UniProtKB/Swiss-Prot annotation:
It comes from the Bacteria. It comes from Priestia megaterium (strain DSM 319 / IMG 1521). Its main location: cytoplasm. The gene is xylA. This is Xylose isomerase. Binds 2 magnesium ions per subunit. InterPro entries: Xyl_isomerase-like_sf (IPR036237), Xylose_isom_bac (IPR013452), Xylose_isomerase (IPR001998). Mg(2+) 1 binds at E238, E274, D302, D345. PROSITE patterns: XYLOSE_ISOMERASE. Its EC number is 5.3.1.5. It is an enzyme of class 5 (isomerase). Keywords: Carbohydrate metabolism, Cytoplasm, Isomerase, Magnesium, Metal-binding, Xylose metabolism.
């Protein structure tokens, strides 16, 4: 048994287990819409939503920003070093139990501090992984995914797999090797690649082709090593257009899918899509989900929301019912997320510094997605949008439209058709009517 040196305290002693009390409840620490065992669309809400807590924002973030110092008040921050790492594990599993969430996710450097050498760092990681494994064995919480932090340490100033320095590439490979071993040890259902610094700031000093080729080589090495050790989790890659680099290589869903297919990686990887990253890319979240879904590569979701008035990754907790409804609509149309889930890659605001704010924030996000699930299920069940779309594209189900779809038409036949049918009649797209219907479903379901 791994012993902590924190005398094991109750980090959330003021909070009872958060329970479902229904929409009329005024209890801020009760679910109004998230009822884990309620069946929606043939599955329980718990299985449809597969909520996950993000270790980094919840247990390591301190509220520091470019303009000010830390603000967060955390009971575990009385410790440091490995004692702090152990206290965070205790606090994490207490929070998981309080919220009754089935999953969590972490970067390697979230859970254990770096040592003076890679060997020492790995030893620190081993201690905490063993501790986490013991907590997992006595709870119902599973690891949704883990990943490697290859962006914080100054060695990654020029990137990791896309670094101009081969020594850095080698170090990054060693770090992901350990990450995959951790994934297998803890039974992670997925392993994520987020290229924090996999991009460039100026082409004046960048060999773009070599960097892309090396990134693909790196990912193929990861696939090969996972096969070697028998790790069978789903590989995921998370797009982001900018920040911290000016041009990230995995800009958005379409760009990332193109990269995966170009290098023969699409049979191994799916996409982990974040709402705020969609905002930064100039897309709606549902756009990114749809692009991945129609390509069969929608894997998991980082559930948050951005501020369209700001140009950076604000990672707010998701409370926008329009966004959660349309996101769940895409997920339901996808048949769910498989081994993926809804991971709250979200942080409380800098001014929400009290420890209980972590609970309020997660309750808000879980309720928002539960509500979105119920509305989306009703929209799918009633075929609200499908019927409109089928009618809108009905000209491709017969006549010249069917010939186009079946590959029987060519420019010669289409020209002759256009000569004979000079009067073109379009129909209204009824966008405002559809938005009104969406409002009605959100308000009434």
């Amino acid at each position: 048994m791994v012993q902590t040196s924190t005398n094991k305290i109750n980090h959330f002693e003021s909070a009872n287990k958060v329970l479902y009390e229904g929409k009329d409840s005024k209890n801020p620490l009760a679910f109004k819409y998230y009822n884990p065992e309620e069946v929606v669309g043939g599955k329980t809400m718990k299985d449809q939503l597969r909520f996950s807590v993000a270790y980094w924002h919840t247990f390591t973030a301190d509220g520091t920003d470019p303009f000010g110092a830390a603000t967060m008040q955390r009971s575990w921050d009385r410790y440091d070093g490995m004692d702090l790492a152990k206290a965070r594990v205790e606090a994490a599993f207490q929070l998981f139990e309080t919220l009754n969430v089935p999953f969590f996710a972490f970067h390697d450097r979230d859970i254990a501090p770096e040592g003076s050498t890679l060997q020492e760092t790995n030893k620190n990681l081993d201690v905490i992984v063993t501790m986490i494994k013991e907590y997992m064995q006595t709870s119902n919480v599973k690891l949704l995914w883990n990943t490697a932090n290859m962006f914080t340490n100054p060695r990654f100033v020029h990137g990791a797999a896309t670094s101009c320095n081969a020594d850095v590439f080698a170090y990054a490979a060693a770090q992901v090797k350990k990450g995959l071993e951790t994934a297998k040890e803890l039974g992670a259902e997925n392993y994520v690649f987020w290229g924090g610094r996999e991009g460039y700031e100026t082409l004046l000093n960048t060999n773009l082709q070599l960097e892309l080729d090396n990134l693909a080589r790196f990912m193929h090495m990861a696939v090969d090593y996972a096969t070697e050790i028998g790790y069978t989790g789903q590989f995921l890659i998370e797009p982001k257009p900018k920040e911290p680099t000016t041009h990230q290589y995995d800009t958005d869903a379409a760009t990332t899918i193109s990269f995966l297919r170009q290098y023969g990686l699409d049979k191994y990887f799916k996409l982990n899509l974040e709402a705020n990253h969609a905002t930064l890319a100039g897309h709606t979240f549902e756009h990114e989900l749809r692009v991945a879904r129609v390509q069969g590569l929608l894997g998991s979701v980082d559930a948050n929301q951005g501020d369209p008035l700001l140009g950076w990754d604000t990672d707010e907790f998701p409370t926008d019912l329009y966004s959660t409804t349309l996101a769940m609509y895409e997920i339901l149309q996808n048949g769910g997320l498989g081994s993926g889930g809804l991971n709250f890659d979200a942080k409380v605001r800098r001014g929400s510094f009290e420890q209980d704010d972590l609970l309020y924030a997660h309750v808000a996000g879980m309720d928002a997605f539960a509500r979105g699930l119920k509305v989306a299920h009703k929209l799918v069940e009633d075929r609200v949008f499908e019927n409109v779309i089928n009618e809108r594209y009905s000209s491709f189900k017969e006549g010249i439209g069917l010939e186009i779809v079946e590959g029987k038409a060519n420019f010669h036949t289409l020209e002759q058709y256009a000569f004979k049918n000079p009067n073109i009649a379009n129909k209204s797209g009824r966008q405002e009517r559809l938005k009104s219907i969406l409002n009605q479903y959100i308000l009434e379901v």
